[in-house]
Amino acid sequence: ITYTDCTESGQDLCLCEGSNVCGKGNKCILGSNGEENQCVTGEGTPKPQSHNDGDFEEIPEEYLQ
């Protein structure tokens, strides 16, 4: 399954290495090998839902507090 760099929630929370999320005001840059993603300053850009249900990974509730 390939995940996009942002979640579909529109909350500017991006999936980064180790399932960590970038906080508001940050965006995720995908590493070339898919393992060295970095959170950097900048607004995230949520991608539209595609035809594949698994394109987006749910954010664990512990990150949404």
Curated annotation (Swiss-Prot):
Q: What is the documented function of this protein?
A: Hirudin is a potent thrombin-specific protease inhibitor. It forms a stable non-covalent complex with alpha-thrombin, thereby abolishing its ability to cleave fibrinogen.
Can you name the source organism? Hirudo medicinalis
Q: Which residues are glycosylated?
A: 45
Subcellular localization, as worded in the UniProt entry:
Secreted
Q: What are the protein's UniProt keywords? A: Disulfide bond, Glycoprotein, Protease inhibitor, Secreted, Serine protease inhibitor, Sulfation
Q: Name one GO cellular component term.
A: extracellular region
Question: Mind telling me what this protein is named?
Answer: Hirudin-2
Q: Which domain of life is it from?
A: Eukaryota
Where in the sequence does UniProt note compositional bias of the Acidic residues kind? 55-65
Q: What is its main location?
A: secreted
Q: Provide the positions where the record notes the PTM Sulfotyrosine.
A: 63
The set of disulfide-linked cysteines is 6-14, 16-28, 22-39
Family, per entry: Belongs to the protease inhibitor I14 (hirudin) family.
One Pfam family for this entry, by name?
Answer: Hirudin
The segments labelled Interaction with fibrinogen-binding exosite of thrombin in the record are 55-65
Q: Name one GO molecular function term.
A: serine-type endopeptidase inhibitor activity
The protein's matches in InterPro entries, at most eight in alphabetical order, are given as: Hirudin, Hirudin/antistatin, Prot_inh_hirudin
